[in-house]
UniProtKB/Swiss-Prot annotation:
Keyword terms: Amino-acid biosynthesis, Cytoplasm, Glutamine amidotransferase, Histidine biosynthesis, Hydrolase, Lyase
Cellular component GO terms held in the UniProt record: cytoplasm
Protein name according to UniProt: Imidazole glycerol phosphate synthase subunit HisH
Organism: Mannheimia succiniciproducens (strain KCTC 0769BP / MBEL55E)
GO MF, one example: imidazoleglycerol-phosphate synthase activity
Catalytic activities: 5-[(5-phospho-1-deoxy-D-ribulos-1-ylimino)methylamino]-1-(5-phospho-beta-D-ribosyl)imidazole-4-carboxamide + L-glutamine = D-erythro-1-(imidazol-4-yl)glycerol 3-phosphate + 5-amino-1-(5-phospho-beta-D-ribosyl)imidazole-4-carboxamide + L-glutamate + H(+); L-glutamine + H2O = L-glutamate + NH4(+)
Pathway: Amino-acid biosynthesis; L-histidine biosynthesis; L-histidine from 5-phospho-alpha-D-ribose 1-diphosphate: step 5/9
EC number: 4.3.2.10, 3.5.1.2
Main location class: cytoplasm
Domain Glutamine amidotransferase type-1: 1-194
Active site (UniProt): C75, H175, E177
Domain of life: Bacteria
InterPro entries from the UniProt entry: Class_I_gatase-like (IPR029062), GATASE (IPR017926), Imidazole-glycPsynth_HisH (IPR010139)
Amino acid sequence: MIIIDTGCANLSSVKFAFDRLNIKAEISRDIATIKSADKLLLPGVGTAMAAMKILQDRNLIETIQNATQPMLGICLGMQLMTEYSSEGNVPTLSLMSGHTDLIPNTGLPLPHMGWNKVRYEQDHPLFAGIEQDSHFYFVHSYAVLPNEHTIATSDYGVPFSAALGCKNFYGVQFHPERSGKNGAQLLKNFVENL
């Protein structure tokens, strides 16, 4: 398992989540290491524009786009998997169709921060052993509205994609590394089931 070094603040907490599961995970920005990994994790905290600049500066965009092994994007990492983010009006990785936009104003404060229910497609391997409508921890102001790649949803005034999946690329808007036993189970499922 390689955690792609995106320079974001949650790298250590993501690695520690795998350590707690006794799953060997290494943080790397080395292209050869990333290409040879059996699984990849794309974390992200911050803005889409800053994250894409870091990936470009580290020559990682093409490597990520050409990955054939299972990859899990977390929070901003999931948003980067779509085609475009209105946060900075920046093209993203285009690993799947869709775009990321500011959560519509429904009177609820932004960012959406805290625990929220997640409803997933029945029998999806990413959510194996996790009860329907379980709670996960979110911190975000931008979201991907439900589309053909949505495998789980949550609601914050409007429904949004809590998880996406397309081919070997998966993403979660919530932070599994901060979501207790449900988050730990999801990370374990990613490693063992996908």
